Each structure stands twice: as structure tokens, then as C-alpha cells.
UniProtKB/Swiss-Prot annotation:
Domain of life: Bacteria
Keyword annotations: Cytoplasm, Glycosyltransferase, Purine salvage, Transferase
Family: Belongs to the purine/pyrimidine phosphoribosyltransferase family.
Major location category of this protein: cytoplasm
Source organism per UniProt: Trichormus variabilis (strain ATCC 29413 / PCC 7937) (Anabaena variabilis)
Family matches, as HAMAP family: Aden_phosphoribosyltr (MF_00004)
Name of this protein: Adenine phosphoribosyltransferase
Binding partners and assembly: Homodimer.
A cellular component term, taken from the record's GO annotations: cytoplasm
Protein EC: 2.4.2.7
Pfam families to which the protein is assigned, alphabetical: Pribosyltran (PF00156)
Any one Gene Ontology BP term: adenine salvage
UniProt-recorded Gene Ontology molecular function terms: adenine binding; adenine phosphoribosyltransferase activity; AMP binding
Length: 172
């Protein structure tokens, strides 16, 4: 299936000069959505990724991470923006183009030595994925890979990620 044909391009969003890759058109297509999850799971099996948990980055990582965890027989753990989780958290601050941001995960969600796959809809510069990886490693977990639906290759996000398998289904 041609996933690119299910992803809508929106020029000048959210600001002039940006070409936004809109996945809502992929999500509404029942065959495309099923294929996306099945294909991502297949790539994880092919890479022999033995995982305990899929971590989904807020918020579109939740959309793909939860069904992927189900397909892989793993648990799902959300990584959220600061202040969104009700219990005690591990947190990490990271640099953005114009400031900083913070990611959090519940303290009781991950245990040291857990094997983790990080999933999101898209990798651009790699900042959020890299911060999530550092958070996982701070806790003492083993990062076994990343899974992305879309990779914007020109932004070279993967060069900021640890040396583990990186799966991307569609490249621009």
C-alpha cells in the first residue's frame, strides 16, 4: 500500500514556509490505518526487537503506540508534556529552537532493565525523540529502537538518536 498517498500535504502550516504532513487522512482510512500498524509491527518483528514496553510520545505517538503494543504483546506507556500526569514522575528538560520543554513519565511505569521501543508519528529534528530516549536511559531501561510513521530525512533527526534500530515507514 502506498502510505504517502494517504498523507495530505498542507503548505504554509503552521507558519509560512512549512509543508505540514497531515496524518488525519491516513487515520480516517480504515485499510490504511490497519496496514500502518501491521507494517510497523512486521518491521519490529523483522528487526528482532524484543520489547517489554512501547512508549508513545505525546500526542500522536499514543495513536500508533497503543495498537502497536497490542500487536507486539507489550505494554504501552505514555510520555507526556509537563503537568499532565497525576502521580510522581521522572522528567527531563530539553532544548527547543526557542526555549525549553519538559517530558514526563510516571515513576512506577518503567522498571530498570525494561526493554523499550519509542514510537511517534513523525521524526523531524529528533529533539523530542532524543529527549525521550535520554529519559528512558536515565531510568535504567534498555532502549531497543524507535518506530516512526514518517521521517523528514532532510532535517537529519536520526543523527541525534542513539545507535539502535530506527524504523520509518514513509520518508520525505
Amino acid at each position: 500500500m502506498d502510505l504517502k498517498s494517504l498523507i495530505r500535504d498542507i503548505p504554509d502550516f503552521p507558519k509560512p514556509g512549512i509543508l505540514f504532513r497531515d496524518i488525519t487522512t491516513l487515520l480516517r482510512d480504515r485499510q490504511g490505518l490497519r496496514y500502518t500498524i501491521d507494517f510497523l509491527a512486521e518491521k519490529c518483528f523483522e528487526a528482532n526487537l524484543d520489547i517489554d514496553y512501547v512508549i508513545g510520545m505525546e500526542s500522536r505517538g499514543f495513536i500508533f503506540g497503543t495498537p502497536l503494543a497490542y500487536k507486539l504483546g507489550a505494554g504501552f506507556i505514555p510520555v507526556r508534556k509537563k503537568g499532565k500526569l497525576p502521580a510522581a514522575v521522572h522528567s527531563i528538560e530539553y532544548e527547543l529552537e526557542y526555549g525549553t520543554d519538559c517530558l514526563e513519565v510516571h515513576r512506577d511505569a518503567l522498571h530498570p532493565d525494561s526493554r523499550v521501543l519509542i514510537v511517534d508519528d513523525l521524526i523531524a529534528t529528533g529533539g523530542t525523540a532524543s529527549a525521550t530516549a535520554k529519559l528512558v536511559q536515565q531510568i535504567g531501561c534498555e532502549l531497543v529502537g524507535f518506530g516512526f510513521i514518517i521521517e523528514l530525512r532532510d532535517l537529519q533527526g536520526r543523527k541525534h538518536l542513539p545507535d539502535v534500530p530506527i524504523i520509518s515507514l514513509v520518508e520525505y
